[in-house]
Amino acid sequence: SGPGSRSGCGAGRTVSRYTLGIDTSNYATSLAVFDTAGEVVCAKKRFLPVKAGQLGLRQSDSLFHHTVALPEMMQELAQEFDLTQIDAVGVSQKPRPVEGSYMPCFLAGVNAATAFAHAKGIPLVLTTHQQGHAAAALFAAKGEQLFAEKVLLFHISGGTTDLLLCDQVRRITTLGTSTDLYAGQAVDRVGVRLGFGFPAGAEVSRLAA
């Protein structure tokens, strides 16, 4: 069988250009293949192992688990999609697009993306975790139309409770932020107290529904 003929989530696609996205945040290792329309063709996600009752991991442990998970997940992705069709790689290099934003866990994704891009001779696009959230929200709302506009966006997660002004996602200005506990942290703390694993957002949402 040749390129494009594999069974799985990449089979039967006629779009010839694909982008591989990599994100190694403080919570999960994530891989996704997108086509030129911005549709997810194939995706893999693995939450980092956190001991019961704990509220996260040390950065050194997060980096270790990402480093272990990435080769395994790339192999899983390759079994479902022909990675020779990838034309570009995008990766989160830090939490937010501001000076001083840094977490070691993102180095795992950057290293994997850089090696993949250089080996194939394809473009490498460095972005941030927050810009990834913003782009996903805009796609979910109105697709590509909002990428040409300035929009106000609330980013509520484990590490942020921010009001953002997004200009085509490439330029993000923080208009307001929490000076206390972030919303996602509050949800996780409640969830862990209730006996759920970390992160607990999905379980708390199901309980509240």
Predicted regions and their residues:
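A short helix-loop
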Residues: 17, 24-25, 42-43, 147, ...
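Short beta-strand-loop/turn "lid" adjacent to the catalytic site in phosphate-handling enzymes
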Residues: 75-114
